[in-house]
Amino acid sequence: MDGERKIKIALTKGRIEKEAVKIFERAGVDCSEVINKGRKLIFHNMESNIDFVLVKAPDVLTYVEHGVVDIGIVGKDTLLEQDKNFYEVLDLGFGKCKFSLAGLKDSNFYSGYNRKKIATKYPNVARSYFRKLGQDVEIIKIEGSVELAPILGLADAIVDIVETGSTLKENGLVIYKDICSISARMVVNMASMKMKKEEIEKIINKVQVQINEIEKAVR
């Protein structure tokens, strides 16, 4: 489009990508190439002057921070875990879940004065939570099924993302405390927000309108 600068948007691969595409389509951006992507990772929309890039969640903020892309669509869990520089501009209202502290049903987690061991895929989130409580804990980073840690005696509890709670229940775990809510967010590179202010604000406004309409429809 004449006079408008190209905007590059990084989408988190998977469920967030699919939900984000629905909103962009509603906002008038043709995402047919992304929908029928095959093995492609980069998509050019000449009409809207937008490029979409598909990346894994932890990499979205890296691309945004370094200015390789202007906008990122990523879960709040990733924002909380990574210490990056960006503007968080929109709560997109999908991908809703929560960070929770959980452990064995019959455990006395809150009793005793021993230093508790906490297993998690999100050490920074867990560390921040217990720091606010003034509680000294040992954080153990886990890459796989974190539910195994208390079952096998590696940890006293876990900090993890919970959606329905069914996985916890099936493994004999219960939620001790909900830490915070999570959903998909739109973030913007700090320099891009200044250099491409008009183009980016146009996208933000279009997406915001669609979010508002979706929220009205489900009330």
Swiss-Prot record:
Keyword ATP-binding set for record: yes
Molecular function as annotated in GO: ATP binding; ATP phosphoribosyltransferase activity
Subunit structure: Heteromultimer composed of HisG and HisZ subunits.
Known role: Catalyzes the condensation of ATP and 5-phosphoribose 1-diphosphate to form N'-(5'-phosphoribosyl)-ATP (PR-ATP). Has a crucial role in the pathway because the rate of histidine biosynthesis seems to be controlled primarily by regulation of HisG enzymatic activity.
Protein family per UniProt: Belongs to the ATP phosphoribosyltransferase family. Short subfamily.
Protein name: ATP phosphoribosyltransferase
Domain remarks: Lacks the C-terminal regulatory region which is replaced by HisZ.
Catalytic activity: 1-(5-phospho-beta-D-ribosyl)-ATP + diphosphate = 5-phospho-alpha-D-ribose 1-diphosphate + ATP
InterPro entries, A to Z: ATP_PRibTrfase_cat, ATP_PRibTrfase_CS, ATP_PRibTrfase_HisG, ATP_PRibTrfase_HisG_short
Main localization category: cytoplasm
PROSITE patterns noted in UniProt: ATP_P_PHORIBOSYLTR (PS01316)
Broad enzyme group: transferase
GO cellular component: cytoplasm
Name of encoding gene: hisG
Keywords: Amino-acid biosynthesis, ATP-binding, Cytoplasm, Glycosyltransferase, Histidine biosynthesis, Nucleotide-binding, Transferase
Pathway assigned in UniProt: Amino-acid biosynthesis; L-histidine biosynthesis; L-histidine from 5-phospho-alpha-D-ribose 1-diphosphate: step 1/9
Domain of life, source organism: Bacteria
Location in or out of the cell: Cytoplasm
Record organism: Clostridium kluyveri (strain ATCC 8527 / DSM 555 / NBRC 12016 / NCIMB 10680 / K1)
Entries under NCBIfam families matching the protein: hisG
UniProt-listed Enzyme Commission number(s): 2.4.2.17
GO process annotations (BP): L-histidine biosynthetic process
